[in-house]
C-alpha cells in the first residue's frame, strides 16, 4: 500500500487496528464469563477490510 494515504483512510485503518484486539481479562471477570472473546476479531490474511 502506498505511503501517502488520505487522512480519513488512515483514521479508519487505525480504528480497525485498535478494534482487532482480544477483550481484557477484567471484562471476562466482570461479566462472570458471559463475554469470553471478541466476535469481531479479524485476521489480516483471511478477512478484507472495506475501508
From Swiss-Prot:
Which molecular function GO terms apply here? structural constituent of ribosome
- Assigned GO CC terms: ribonucleoprotein complex; ribosome
Q: Which UniProt keywords apply?
A: Ribonucleoprotein, Ribosomal protein
According to UniProt, the name of this protein is Large ribosomal subunit protein eL39
Which InterPro entries does its entry note? Ribosomal_eL39, Ribosomal_eL39_CS, Ribosomal_eL39_dom_sf
**Superkingdom classification of source:** Archaea
List this protein's GO terms for biological process.
translation
Q: Which gene is transcribed and translated to give this protein?
A: rpl39e
Q: Which family does it belong to?
A: Belongs to the eukaryotic ribosomal protein eL39 family.
Q: What PROSITE patterns does the entry give?
A: RIBOSOMAL_L39E (PS00051)
Amino acid at each position: 500500500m502506498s505511503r501517502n494515504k488520505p487522512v480519513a483512510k488512515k483514521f479508519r485503518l487505525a480504528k480497525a487496528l485498535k478494534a482487532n484486539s482480544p477483550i481484557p481479562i477484567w471484562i471476562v471477570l466482570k461479566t462472570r464469563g458471559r463475554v469470553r472473546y471478541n466476535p469481531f476479531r479479524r485476521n489480516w490474511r483471511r478477512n478484507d477490510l472495506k475501508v
